[in-house]
Regions:
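Short helical segment in ABC ATPase nucleotide-binding domains corresponding to the A-loop/adjacent helical element
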Residues: 92-102, 112, 116, 220
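Conserved signature/switch motifs of ABC ATPase nucleotide-binding domains
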Residues: 130-133, 151
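Helix-to-loop junction immediately C-terminal to a conserved catalytic motif
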Residues: 52
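Conserved ABC transporter NBD signature motif
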Residues: 60-72
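The feature captures the beta-strand-to-loop junction immediately N-terminal to the Walker
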Residues: 37-39
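Conserved ABC ATPase "signature" region
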Residues: 102, 109-127, 179
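Catalytic Walker B motif of ABC-type/P-loop ATPase nucleotide-binding domains
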Residues: 156-159
């Protein structure tokens, strides 16, 4: 379980004080896939960095399995938007994936086993010996996902990971995330600016307000577990959920709801 309790983040410098996140509280249950959406610049990335121990909050706390997060916890992995910067171009794909595993007390044989399993999970076994620059953008992001999977995390934090790929690749990667979530039971917190993506991927959508960020709404996504790009996206219920989230984000832009967060079941 991932708990965010009264989280607050203030940036200070050059005589300015900017409150990015204000008294933010929510829970992500173990094995849940939750999407975070909100207006542009609302503090989604700041929140994710605080949750992952990459940025110290000004107030409040984040708990993973009941333990306070004060630095990057061993049970957590990240996938970022800029996959080109997270992969080392001079290292082969398999070596990129293995690199974080060297921090663990694992034999070389075990590391290779985890790398092979992760590559198979993202359908990139044949690319193990390639360099990242030889792969398409979508394939590079699959490598980044494989590296996170090989780490065997309890929680996977994903910060707009598909924003830089084309529409077809994005659809394929969305289906990959849903499949990996079902197969591995990982807790996933997925940040996106795309409303359709949030509704398609998530079992729950958390809508954030404009900065300073609070929870505008938590919405249960009551779509079937089995989803596909053709049928799910044209379903009447998908359209209803998408419209509802869109309306909430528009309200957030106007400043509505910040004093009275709501939950929709």
């Amino acid at each position: 379980m991932l708990d965010v309790r009264g989280l607050n983040k203030v940036y200070e410098g050059s005589g300015r004080r900017v409150e990015a996140v204000r008294d933010l509280t929510f829970t992500v249950e173990a094995g849940e896939l939750v999407c975070l959406v909100g207006p542009s610049g609302c503090g989604k990335t700041t929140l994710l960095k605080c949750m992952g121990g990459l940025l110290a909050p000004t107030g409040g706390e984040v708990l993973l399995g009941g333990r306070k997060v004060s630095g990057p916890p061993p049970g957590m992995a990240f996938v970022f938007q800029e996959y080109g910067r997270s992969l080392f171009p001079w290292m082969r794909v398999a070596d990129n994936i293995e690199l974080p595993l060297k921090q663990k007390d694992l034999s070389k044989a075990r590391r290779r086993e985890l790398v092979a399993d992760a590559l198979e999970s993202v359908d990139l076994t044949e690319a193990a010996g390639a360099y990242p620059w030889q792969l398409s953008g979508g394939m590079q992001q699959r490598v980044a996902i494989a590296r996170a999977l090989a780490y065997e995390p309890e929680v996977l934090l994903m910060d707009e990971p598909f924003a830089a790929v084309d529409a077809q690749t994005r659809a394929d990667l969305e289906d990959l995330v849903r499949r990996l979530w079902r197969e591995r039971g990982i807790t996933i917190l997925f940040v996106t600016h795309d409303i359709d993506e949030a509704v398609y991927l998530g079992e729950r959508v958390i809508v954030l307000s404009a900065s300073p960020t609070v929870v505008q709404e938590q919405l249960k996504v009551d779509l079937p577990d089995e989803r596909d790009q053709l049928h799910t996206r044209v379903a009447p219920r998908f359209a209803e959920l998408r419209t509802h989230v869109y309306e909430q984000i528009q309200a957030a832009k106007r400043g509505g709801g910040q004093d009275a967060p709501v939950t929709a079941e």
